[in-house]
Amino acid sequence: MSVILRNDYGAIAVNKGVIERMIIDDLLDIGDEIILCTKKGKPIKDKPARFYDPSRFTDPDYFDAVEVYEKKQQVRVKVFIITAFGSSISELTDEIFRRIENDFAILKLNNPGIITVNIKGVMSEDQIVRRNIEVIRKNV
């Protein structure tokens, strides 16, 4: 499935898997502050494999952490994460928003209409405490 992005020059179709892969790669670069998770808050991996590492394959479970879809002629992005205890939610979400918008700029696309970061839990030393915090950025 592809996402169709429209601008003054016409329409561009980009495979949503390409955008999701770029976003996941950026999320993995953030480091120990986040763990990618599913919609229900289940952690995907403790030490995920990198996409650009030729010795490893892409695990399809990673794609459960990111949703890219089109609604009302806007691209929308949802990200599902678990944060580390003590990390600043505002700083962390701002960094995620900036990286996602940068990915769209690399592809010469308009910023997504809505970016949503769903924080499904907070990880302490030995357990994950469930949370359901949603931080939204609207680009109009």
Language model features by range: what are they?
Residues 1-95, 106, 110, 116, ...:
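Contiguous, often N-terminal, cationic amphipathic patches that form binding interfaces
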Residues 98:
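Short acidic (Asp/Glu) patches
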Residues 101-103:
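Acidic-enriched and Gly/Ser
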